[in-house]
């Protein structure tokens, strides 16, 4: 059975594509770096959009948090550009959040790799 797509889902996808382009081309802040828009959640009434981002090449989480603060300060400008681009009468209010899922996934992968290596070492030690 096909899943229904609500208008808010379509708007979220359009905002994600638009933000990815606008942030790279029109936001000129050296603290920003290369930003990935991971997902956008828009409320059903289209009044608020939560934008989850990661910063490529950020060595520490604090660098990503600085980028999120820069994006939140530029939210009004970005909202205006998106409203014009998507020809919306009023665009949702944008709130940016650092998406920790990539970091958590990498940490989990490292834990699994260490557990597999320890298990392999243990089985080799028992085999001798």
From Swiss-Prot:
Subcellular location: Cytoplasm
Key words, A-Z: Cytoplasm, Ribosome biogenesis
Superkingdom per UniProt: Bacteria
An annotated GO BP: maturation of SSU-rRNA
Record-level GO cellular component terms: cytosol
Entry-linked HAMAP family: RbfA
Biological role stated in the UniProt entry: One of several proteins that assist in the late maturation steps of the functional core of the 30S ribosomal subunit. Associates with free 30S ribosomal subunits (but not with 30S subunits that are part of 70S ribosomes or polysomes). Required for efficient processing of 16S rRNA. May interact with the 5'-terminal helix region of 16S rRNA.
Family, as annotated: Belongs to the RbfA family.
Descriptive protein name: Ribosome-binding factor A
The species this protein was found in: Saccharophagus degradans (strain 2-40 / ATCC 43961 / DSM 17024)
Organism lineage: Bacteria, Pseudomonadati, Pseudomonadota, Gammaproteobacteria, Cellvibrionales
Gene that this polypeptide is encoded by: rbfA
């Amino acid at each position: 059975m096909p899943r229904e797509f609500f208008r808010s889902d379509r708007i979220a996808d359009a905002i994600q594509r638009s933000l990815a382009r606008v942030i790279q081309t029109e936001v000129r802040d050296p603290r920003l770096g290369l930003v990935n828009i991971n997902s956008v959640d828009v409320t059903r009434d289209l009044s608020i959009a939560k934008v989850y981002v990661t910063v490529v090449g950020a060595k520490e989480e604090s660098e990503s948090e600085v980028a999120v603060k820069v994006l939140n300060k530029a939210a009004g400008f970005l909202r205006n550009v998106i409203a014009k681009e998507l020809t919306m009468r009023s665009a949702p209010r944008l709130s940016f959040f650092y998406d920790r899922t990539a970091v958590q996934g990498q940490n989990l992968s490292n834990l699994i790799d260490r557990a597999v290596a320890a298990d392999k070492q243990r089985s080799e030690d028992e085999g001798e």
